[in-house]
Each structure stands twice: as C-alpha cells, then as structure tokens.
C-alpha cells in the first residue's frame, strides 16, 4: 500500500502547526529588542528609587498644572523599500502622533513634531547599515527624540529580543536568518553630557515596525502602541517583567507601584498573575508590558515620576 496519503497528511499537519506557531507569536509583543540597562543606569534607578516617589497624581489636574511641562522635540523618519513608498500615509503619521500625545498627557509630557523625513531605501527599510542611516537622518541633540518607522524592520542574529529564540525553536528558523520584530529603543545613557559629541549618541532613538502604526496591517498591534512602548524606554522605563523572576533578589523595573511580574503578557487576558505569592496582579494594561494594543491604556504614577526624573537628569539641556 502506498504511503503517500499518510505522508501528505503529515506534511499538512506540520504546516498547520507552523501556521499556529506564527499565530501564537503574532499575539505576543515578544519582539521588543531593547536591551537590559547598564550598571550605571541601574545605579541611577536605585538612586531615584531611594528618593521615593514624588507627590504627583497624573489624574489630578491641579497636580499636573503645578509641575513643569516637558516638551520633547521630535522627528519621525519614514523608511520604506523602493517599491513601497506609499505604504505609510500622512494620516497614519498624524494618528500616531495623536496617540503619542494622548498616551503621555497625564505625565505632562508632550511631543513637538519638528518634521517628517521620508526615505525609500531597501537596505534601511530592513534596518541594515543602521549607523549610516542614522548618520544621514538623525536630527537634533541628545534631548531630541528620533523615531524611525521601518516597513521591514529586521533583527540581526545577535539581537537580544526575548522571543527570537522562541520563534527559532518552534519553527526551526536558522540562527543566521533575520527575524522581524516590532521595535527597539535606546535607554538613557548616564555617560552622555552637554559636551558629548553627536557621534557618541548617533544611534539614540527608537526603531519601530511601520505596520504597528495606526491603520497598519499587523492585527492586534496596529493602533500605535508599539511606538508608545518603545518611547517609554527612551524616557527611561523598563519592562514591567524586567528580570522575569518572582525572586526577592529581582529588582525588576525599579518602579514601586508596578507589581512584580515574571512573564510578559501575551494578547489581552482578563487577568494574569505570574507571581501569585506576591501582592498584585500583572500590569496587563501597562504600556511597558507586552500586551496587544487593545489592552494598553496607562502608565502608573511612579512610572510617570520616573520618566520626568529621568528627563531632567539624563536628557534636558543635552
């Protein structure tokens, strides 16, 4: 008897499993490749934590009015392949900026768009030759936010995103094969000062997959939440699950009012508690978790205080 039908069925089953794995991965924001904080940055987090949370209620209008507004000069760089120059519309750019303003409004942080550049370059669209790209495109000083929206953002084989190994393991992807990701961003660097030459911070900024912009094609991640998440890193925030441990030795994200969390969130569950022996549920609605866009809605008061403290300590005047 021929074994062809059995082999054919097996191939279909394997193909279906691969599709399911891709679907599983697409429900997880495991593609943020922002690296861990340096020891000097950890020391700054500890210093700020020791000072305690500022008396600030982000919902209280009087509290908001009493503090100095932070206005961040911002550049958006739209980078497409040569055959996809129409993929990112002006409406998508405007909607992303609007969401950015709304997400940080309670922190009294706003973003003053200085301009938008558009580049059609297949290499840059994949984030290859990043140094050359940013040397040409980057604008402003260390206090200026530059966001690069790539239509085909890729991770190098050495990138540090948590989900890359999961993807490769499940799908049998070669370690040499580049993997798509949602974004990454630089954390503040304590070594940068007002006299630092631009060459020392040329890579500063956020790289974001353009499909995650409002109206993009990536289901569950096309409301603009990835840019909010990545810019949170630029403002000095870590993942809510930093350290991925429930251990008392884990300093986590150095934020007092985010419950300890050992695993990133996938999708938008009704509730999740990855450290059940510790107080609080996982912050599934927090912009610094890995939840899907429909789940995102807030930063905590201590995260707000941390971003503001980091701005004045690390970026203002530089």
From Swiss-Prot:
Stretch forming the signal peptide: 1-23
Main localization category: secreted
GO molecular function, one term: metal ion binding
Top-level taxon of the source organism: Eukaryota
Record keywords: Disulfide bond, Glycoprotein, Hydrolase, Metal-binding, Metalloprotease, Protease, Secreted, Signal, Zinc
CDD domains: ZnMc_pappalysin_like (cd04275)
Function description: Secreted metalloproteinase that allows assimilation of proteinaceous substrates.
Name the record gives this protein: Extracellular metalloprotease AO090012001025
Organism per entry: Aspergillus oryzae (strain ATCC 42149 / RIB 40) (Yellow koji mold)
């Amino acid at each position: 008897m021929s074994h062809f039908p059995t082999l054919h069925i097996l191939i279909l089953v394997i193909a279906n499993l691969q599709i399911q794995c891709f679907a599983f991965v697409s429900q997880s924001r495991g593609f943020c490749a922002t690296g861990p904080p340096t020891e000097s940055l950890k020391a700054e987090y500890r210093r700020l934590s020791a000072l305690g949370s500022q008396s600030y209620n982000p919902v209280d209008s009087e509290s908001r009015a009493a503090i100095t507004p932070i206005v961040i000069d911002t550049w958006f760089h739209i980078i497409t392949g040569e055959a996809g120059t129409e993929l990112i519309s002006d409406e998508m750019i405007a909607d992303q900026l609007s969401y950015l303003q709304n997400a940080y409004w309670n922190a009294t942080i706003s973003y003053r768009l200085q301009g938008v550049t558009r580049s059609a370059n297949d290499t840059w669209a994949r984030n290859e030759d990043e140094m050359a790209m940013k040397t040409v495109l980057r604008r402003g000083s260390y206090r200026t936010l530059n966001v690069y929206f790539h239509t085909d953002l890729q991770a190098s084989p050495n990138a540090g995103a948590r989900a890359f190994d999961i993807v490769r393991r499940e799908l049998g992807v070669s370690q040499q094969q580049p993997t798509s990701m949602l974004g990454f961003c630089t954390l503040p660097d304590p070594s940068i000062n007002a006299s630092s030459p631009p060459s020392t911070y040329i890579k500063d900024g956020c790289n974001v997959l353009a499909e995650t912009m409002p109206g993009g094609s990536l289901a569950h991640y096309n409301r603009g939440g990835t840019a909010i998440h990545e810019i949170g890193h630029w403002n000095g925030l870590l993942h809510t699950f930093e350290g991925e441990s429930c251990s008392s030795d884990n300093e986590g994200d150095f934020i007092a009012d985010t419950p300890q969390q050992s695993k990133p969130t996938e999708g938008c569950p009704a509730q999740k508690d990855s450290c059940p022996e510790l107080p609080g549920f996982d912050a599934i609605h927090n912009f610094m978790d890995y939840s899907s866009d429909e789940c995102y809605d807030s930063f905590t008061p201590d995260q707000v205080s941390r971003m503001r403290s980091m701005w004045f300590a690390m970026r203002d005047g530089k």
